[in-house]
């Protein structure tokens, strides 16, 4: 039987709420991608060019360290991967997560939260961080008032 994991990164809690709803609707396990050093409000100030998030997103080779709480991906076929959109793509900690695990042969379906921007080239950007046999599919932006019934319909369309 195929097993699904919802893995997510949330700096402010918005993506956490969406991920919890997706996991509940999918009957999936939930895993939080945690940075070794939590983000503060100052770190997330996108208007400040010297803020931590601004520096990380400017440097495409930035790979923020993960907190030490591993997940065993071998038991999962599908990973629903959630994150906020930062600068029209995934935060670089998502690359850290992808590069820290073996996703060969797995399907990764993206979902994101955003204050206004879309996925852009996110799927293509992240493909560079996984084995060539991994499939990355752009999913949905989950913004505003989320309804579990709408999430279930989306998951059903995906075959989950």
Positions of PLM-derived features:
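N-terminal beta1-alpha1-beta2 submodule of the flavodoxin-like/Rossmannoid cofactor-binding fold
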Residues: 1-81, 88-90, 95-99, 132, ...
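Conserved strand-to-loop "acid loop" that flanks and positions the catalytic carboxylate
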Residues: 83-84, 112
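Short aromatic/basic micro-patch
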Residues: 102
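Short, glycine-/small-residue-rich phosphate/pyrophosphate-handling segment
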Residues: 109-146
């Amino acid at each position: 039987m195929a097993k699904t994991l919802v893995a997510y990164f949330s700096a402010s809690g918005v993506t956490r709420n969406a991920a919890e709803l997706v996991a509940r609707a999918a009957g999936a396990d939930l895993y939080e991608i945690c940075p070794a050093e939590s983000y503060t409000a100052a770190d997330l100030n996108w208007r400040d060019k010297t803020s931590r998030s601004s520096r990380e997103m400017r440097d495409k080779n930035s790979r923020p360290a993960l907190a030490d709480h591993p997940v065993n991906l071998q038991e999962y076929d599908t990973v629903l991967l959630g994150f906020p959109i930062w600068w029209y793509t995934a935060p670089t900690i998502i690359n850290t997560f992808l590069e820290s695990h073996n996703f060969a042969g797995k399907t990764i379906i993206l979902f994101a939260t955003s204050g206004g921007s879309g996925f852009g080239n996110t799927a293509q950007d992240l493909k560079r961080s996984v084995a060539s046999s991994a499939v990355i599919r752009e999913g949905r932006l989950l913004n505003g008032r989320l309804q579990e019934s709408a999430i279930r319909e989306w998951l059903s369309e995906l075959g989950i």
